[in-house]
Design a protein with these regions (language model features):
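Metal-dependent nuclease catalytic cores that hydrolyze phosphodiester bonds in DNA/RNA
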Residues: 1-101, 209
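Active-site catalytic microenvironments for nucleophilic, acid-base chemistry
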Residues: 15, 128-133
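Metal-dependent nuclease catalytic regions and adjoining charged, substrate-binding loops involved
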Residues: 75-88, 113, 132-209
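Hydrophobic residues embedded in beta-strands of well-ordered beta-sheets
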Residues: 101-103, 150-151
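Glycine- and acidic-rich phosphate- and metal-coordinating loops
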Residues: 102-106, 142-144
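Short beta-strand-loop-alpha-helix junction that forms the active-site gateway
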Residues: 105-115
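Short, conserved loop/turn and helix-capping segments at secondary-structure boundaries
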Residues: 116-121, 158
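Short amphipathic alpha-helical face segments that pack within enzyme cores
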Residues: 121-129
Length: 209
């Protein structure tokens, strides 16, 4: 939502479903740190998502080839729910390694350097949750860009924590019926709501009904 709260406003009532590429990357992630058997992973993937496009088996092979170029820590826990009652947020950690480091899985390619803003926000939200649950400071977490076989550590910065809090305020405002203003760096050129947005930005929900 932090990239463009207006888009979040329009999408807030739409059903959320994972992409086919994510289904592949997610299933592969359970095997990181162990030999990656394409056939085993594919059979698991279609068992979870029976309607998956068969051509994505080629995508799985590309992901495996990329991941085989690096070293990965095997997970001792997967799909761990985390909660912050203070902030009213709930999240999911995809993988936790034996040394306590946590990771989230992405089906996107990696940036040349660093991590995407949305990924930094998610890591920061998880850090808030873990700190409340454990009472210990959380330095950061890893983002695993499966298609490129890249794992990037993001150390949570004060600006990330401020962004989380600001985003939660925007979320609350939208739930109260306010139409948010789009930010200066909003990705309007590739947004499917561009025309709708330009005609209604700045109005309240009550004015649109």
């Amino acid at each position: 939502m932090h990239a463009c709260p207006v888009r979040f406003y329009y999408e807030r009532k739409e059903p959320v479903s994972e992409s086919d590429r994510y289904a592949v990357c997610k299933q592969l992630s359970y095997h990181l740190g162990t030999p990656l058997d394409a056939e085993v992973i594919w059979q698991e993937t279609i068992a979870v998502s029976p309607a998956l496009d068969p051509t994505l088996k080629d995508f799985l092979s590309l992901c495996i080839n990329a991941c085989n170029k690096g070293e990965w820590k095997p997970a001792v826990q997967t799909d761990v729910k985390v909660v912050s009652d203070k902030l009213g947020i709930v999240g999911m950690i995809d993988r936790i390694a034996a040394d306590g480091t946590f990771s989230i899985v992405r089906a996107a390619g990696a940036m040349p350097f660093g991590t995407y803003a949305a990924d930094r926000l998610r890591i920061s939200c998880i850090a808030f949750c873990l700190e409340e649950m454990t009472g210990s400071e959380v330095k950061g977490g890893c983002v695993e860009y499966i298609p490129d076989g890249v794992s990037r550590m993001h150390e949570v910065q004060p600006r990330d924590r401020r962004q989380v809090i600001a985003t939660l305020h925007k979320h609350k405002s939208i739930k109260n019926g306010d139409m948010p203003q789009h930010p200066l760096n909003a990705p309007c050129n590739r947004c499917k709501y561009r025309e709708k947005c330009e005609s209604s930005v700045g109005k309240r929900l009550s004015e649109l009904l």
